[in-house]
Amino acid sequence: MKKPLKIILIILAVIVGLVAALLIWLTATQLNVKTETAVVTHGENSTASFAPGDDVSILTWNVGYAGLGEESDFFMDGGKQVRAPSKAVAEKNMDGIVSTVEALDADFTFLQEIEADPSTRSYGIEEAERMRTETGLDTAHARNYKCAFVPYPIPPIGKVSSGIMTLATAPIASAERIALPSPFKWPVSVANLKRCLMPVYIDLEGTDAQLVLVNLHLEAYDDGEGKAAQTAALKSFLEQEYAKGNYVIAGGDFNQTFPGGLDKYPIKNAELWTPGTLDDSMLPDGWRFAYDTSAPTCRLDNQPYDAESDATQHYVIDGFILSPNVELTSVQTQDDGFRFSDHNPVLLNIRLK
């Protein structure tokens, strides 16, 4: 064998070996959906109580790991960045997220894309811990993204440990992590999210029924089959809980447009990210969506936010599903101009029948 060819083969063998070693390492350290069933709960400070007939407020907000504020774009949406331009910007976003949650003062808050542990993309900010300590509320947190090193793009995303979090003014009786079907196969799956539902159970006074609050963040970057399968699993779970006599509310980032959302905010460029669609017909009799189209709940991260730009794409993909024994009082998107996240908070007010 000629020496140049031998050198090339050695180099190729080393590259293949390194890639194989990386895949083995990532596979061994990824979030294991078969064993990751526990939800981390904190606090014994919350003392509010609720009963049938009471009013309840619930906030949902995808906070974008404090990395997708007005200054940012994102490579998966047609932008270039993998995180906020600087740690100072990420800190600004996190400060704004905490202060906004405190100002809206909901009885329960559903957060998505909040880091469970320090992550590269959020400059090591202790996001879940900050939210717990600064609000002083009882919390539940379930991870849906754990990867020791996401190797793409260039520069890479790096280490990620993130998930969904619920804040409660009432004591949390229990909480679960329920795995959702994934559209991704190995090896792509090792660096992707492992989506889940996180139901939190709140005891109600004067009844054996519970208030079941389901925090969710459904699939984003798939061909649509993942969203459909996860939505079907969500529907099945909600019906099971309602059949037990419980009051059931699901909320979060559906990554699917609510009815009428595309009429208000039509797709401008179908070559960029396009959400799935939700339809009222998917819900059983008596169930309903709760959402607000008066302001967008999400923007496309193809560029830093510019409300006046023709390239700016808005969506309505954040909202709620209510069981028949839950009466909708109001739902309003809090239009904050996407200062701290690429999503706006959505505030729901309901009454337990």
Task: Identify the function of each model-found stretch.
Residues K3-T133, L137, H141-Y152, P156-S161, ...:
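N-terminal, active-site-proximal structural segment of metallo-dependent hydrolase catalytic domains
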Residues L5-I11, L23-S46, S236-I249, Q256-K353:
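Metal-dependent phosphoester-hydrolase catalytic domains
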Residues E36, A148-L211, N215:
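A well-ordered secondary-structure block
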Residues S57-V63, N93-R121, L167, V200-I202, ...:
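Active-site beta-strand/loop signature of hydrolases that rely on acidic residues for catalysis
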Residues V63-A66, E115-P118, Y145-A148, I172-A173, ...:
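Solvent-exposed loop/turn segments at secondary-structure junctions
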Residues K80-K87, I114-D117, P181-S189, H217-E225:
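Surface-exposed cleft-lining segments at the edges of enzyme active sites
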Residues T133-G136, K159-A175, I202-D203, A311-E327, ...:
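Conserved beta strand-loop-helix elements of the APE1-like EEP
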Residues T139-C147, A175-P181, S330-Q334:
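Conserved S-adenosyl-L-methionine
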